[in-house]
From Swiss-Prot:
It comes from Methanocaldococcus jannaschii (strain ATCC 43067 / DSM 2661 / JAL-1 / JCM 10045 / NBRC 100440) (Methanococcus jannaschii). This is Uncharacterized protein MJ0327. It comes from the Archaea. InterPro entries: Di-Nase_FeMo-co_biosynth, DiNase_FeMo-co_biosyn_sf, NifX/NifY_domain.
Amino acid sequence: MINMKVAISMDVDKISNSFEDCKYFLIVRIDDNEVKSTKVIFNDESGKKSIVKENVNAIICKNISEENYKKFSKKIEIYHAEGDDVDKNISLFIEGELSKISNP
């Protein structure tokens, strides 16, 4: 069973090509393998800090800089998004089908 919070880097209605340049983060709370709630955090000056404040357990993104990887990967698992579809990536995450990013 997955019970955690996940941050997904997004642009409008799809996964962003860049963690650093995304427009916002979608925070998804998953309990018992089901999405229970979502919340949007804009990627402004405090956006990336808000991910930590939200106590997320994982990040889903296409690309992440080495600097941010080092900053976040100590406490948060980082997964590589498959394509642009947000819902599909959430499902893949719940099913354990997304690959962890081990080196940006």
